[in-house]
Amino acid sequence: MPVNPANPAGPATTSGTAQSSGAPVSVGIVLVSHSRSLAESALDLARRLIVAVDVPVELAAGLADGALGTDPGLIVSVVEPLADRCDGVLMLADLGRGIMSAEMALEMLEPAVDDRVRLSAAPFVEGLLGAYGAAGIGKDLAAVAAEADGAAEAKRSQVSAF
């Protein structure tokens, strides 16, 4: 995974473009995580399991010094350029403080950008898989968010089946 060139030990971002139909993907995804390696691994899993598409995904993961943590300013710096390239942006956060940082970042965005960004309550990995697949086939932000949010119920039904 690429490293932030301004800070090799700091948070990384990575992105892709749609390959499935030649059309641009309308929704990008931001992974907000306390751990850069967790976000990179989750993205790697999504890309390996859903190989027919390549969705723009950016990481807002870890702190500039390489420590665990989240930073609302970093989230904003990742969301804004992604929102410039996509019709909508879905954020997925790993844990409570990540959610708080993502909510703070939403408040820091310009209204024109904020209107096109949504924070999902979906589980991090399962939500990413659902969102990645839905975004990869060109679904809009509401549909991508619904796919991510439905991941928890799908997992719950699998677990209760045993």
Say what each PLM segment does.
Residues P2-F162:
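N-terminal loops that bind phosphate or other acidic moieties
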